[in-house]
Structures are given as structure tokens and as C-alpha cells.
Design a protein with these regions (language model features):
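Intrinsically disordered, low-complexity Pro/Gly/Ser/Thr-rich segments with frequent PxxP/GP/PP motifs
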Residues: 78-106
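Beta-sheet-dominated interaction scaffolds and their linkers
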Residues: 30-53
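Bacterial N-terminal signal peptides that target proteins for export
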Residues: 2-16
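Terminal connector regions
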Residues: 104-146
Length: 146
């Protein structure tokens, strides 16, 4: 029983050390990135628009941001207009999304929920490429209450 517990402790320490070393070896692990200015958007039904800041906290990465609204099934909704739907955000800059509802009347006795999607595609300097490269785009999804 004692040997089993020692092996469990060793395995846990090995996993923690491996994670710590791998995270430190990744060059952009702590470089920052794209953040949305809220965890949810509340769009009051009588208002013309709602706003959401998008922040690039990276000191050297530029991103292409694509945004859209989807319904509960994940299908893109044409009832919303987001400006700008596609834009470039430079390092240490901020942009504001404007979300406008242009669809039919929604129920007034309860909130309707939609999902705001924001995809961040990192730019790449082709002159610095040598060999294979893996580029990962991240997508954030937050709730949009109307």
C-alpha cells in the first residue's frame, strides 16, 4: 500500500514537472493575445445597439478577427448586424464591436439567448518561415442575451 502511494506521488510530480517545462518552452505561451471585454453581452430590447470591446494584449502579434452571431443550434443568425464583422487588430490595440438587432420581434416575457462568436486568426511573417509551421486560430463564444 505504501509503495502504491509513493508511485502515485511520483507520477503526479512527473506530470507537474512535464507541464511546467513544456509551458516554459513555448515561445508565445505568455505573450498575450485576444480578449473580449465581457463574459456575456446583454442587449436591452429597446436599445439600438450593444457594444463589446476586443483587446489585443500581445506586444508583437497582429490578428484578423471575424465575428458573427449564432442561435442556440449553432446556426449563423442573419437577425444581427455586427460592425465590423472582419477587421485587423494590431498589438496593444483595442476595437469596439457594435451589435445591432435587425430581426423580427422577440418574445417580451422572457430573454432570448444567442451566441456571439469571435475567431482570432494570427498573422504570420512569411519571410521568417523555415520548415513546417502550425498556425492555430482560436474561437471565443459568449452568450448574447436580448
Amino acid at each position: 500500500m505504501k509503495g502504491f502511494m509513493i508511485n502515485q506521488l511520483r507520477a503526479g510530480l512527473f506530470m507537474a514537472a512535464t507541464f511546467t517545462l513544456t509551458a516554459g518552452m513555448t515561445p508565445d505561451a505568455n505573450a498575450g493575445g485576444i480578449a473580449l471585454g465581457a463574459t456575456r453581452v446583454i442587449y436591452p430590447q429597446g436599445d439600438k445597439q450593444a457594444s463589446l470591446p476586443v483587446i489585443n494584449s500581445s506586444s508583437n502579434n497582429t490578428f484578423l478577427i471575424q465575428t458573427w452571431v449564432a442561435n442556440a443550434d449553432g446556426v449563423k443568425s442573419s437577425d444581427f448586424i455586427i460592425t465590423p464583422p472582419l477587421f485587423v487588430i494590431h498589438p496593444k490595440k483595442e476595437n469596439t464591436l457594435r451589435i445591432m438587432y435587425a430581426g423580427p420581434d422577440l418574445p417580451t416575457d422572457r430573454e432570448s439567448v444567442f451566441y456571439l462568436n469571435s475567431k482570432a486568426i494570427p498573422s504570420i511573417d512569411k519571410s521568417k518561415l523555415n520548415g513546417n509551421t502550425l498556425q492555430i486560430a482560436t474561437q471565443s463564444v459568449i452568450k448574447l442575451f436580448v
